[in-house]
Amino acid sequence: MFSGSIVALVTPLDTDGEVDYTSLKNLVDYHINAGTDGIVAVGTTGESATLSVEEHVKLVMKTLEFSDGRIPVIAGTGANATHEAVTFSKLFRDSGVAGCLSVTPYYNKPTQEGLFLHYKAISESTDVPQILYNVPGRTAVDLLPETVARLAEFDNIVALKDATAELDRIAITRELCGDKFIQLSGDDATALEFVKMGGHGVISVTANVAAKDMATMFALAAQGKFEEAEIINQRLMPLHQDLFVEANPMPVKWATHRLGMITHPDIRLPLTELSHSAQPVVEQALIRAGVLK
């Protein structure tokens, strides 16, 4: 259902801070032409935390419109209030999205029981396939494998995006949840190793600027051609690392603009445009990876 290279798509904005739908269409077409396996619209890389509900919904619907059935679209639906996450999930119930990606509630630090009840409420509100998203470095809460296993009992909770970079969790989660439960890496630098150890793919920041390479790498991995995949991975490693030189999505937003993929590098406060000191770092990463000549 979900595998390969899925891009955590940036949300292009104009100089007034409004969504730039012309650039969005260009990004969607770029990923379709590059062979990207799926698009996450309005995930955390897409600045979900600083968009209004109306903007959020319109962005997902426009992404669906622009994709026109040519690529699976996953809607970001996470929130730190359960009722809000439920509302998003209901809004996309009949939209045509392939699934919903819901980050763990951030800042309020729920217990494992709170996380279970949060996702249970979401699951019971919709029949759309749900992807859990664990990124404790950003949320200050860790969705443990034992809790994932409880949630995997719900028919429409089908996958986990794991951004912990703790590769030992793959086997633990597979043992608890079974082989059919989908595990996706949320950490580009360790994503290929994640797949070697039994994962199914990646939800990627790097794919924003190196879509064809990422799609090729994970297609090779799916065929067991890990040596060939590793050659690509090593070339892309500067991006995997330096696209996080400052808080995501600041570097990747600047990088997509530097490559001419979006019209403006603007980003919403409290995030700011990539600092002048970090811009050469990202530019050199683009050059070393072979995506900027």
Swiss-Prot record:
One of its GO terms (cellular component) is cytosol. It comes from Aliivibrio salmonicida (strain LFI1238) (Vibrio salmonicida (strain LFI1238)). Its main location: cytoplasm. Pfam families: DHDPS. It is found in: Cytoplasm. One of its GO terms (biological process) is diaminopimelate biosynthetic process. Gene3D superfamilies: Aldolase class I. This is 4-hydroxy-tetrahydrodipicolinate synthase. SMART domains: DHDPS (SM01130). The keyword Amino-acid biosynthesis applies. Belongs to the DapA family. Catalyzes the condensation of (S)-aspartate-beta-semialdehyde [(S)-ASA] and pyruvate to 4-hydroxy-tetrahydrodipicolinate (HTPA). The record marks T44, Y107 as: Part of a proton relay during catalysis. InterPro entries: Aldolase_TIM, DapA, DapA-like, Schiff_base-form_aldolases_AS, Schiff_base-form_aldolases_CS. Keywords: Amino-acid biosynthesis, Cytoplasm, Diaminopimelate biosynthesis, Lyase, Lysine biosynthesis, Schiff base. Pyruvate binds at T45, I203.
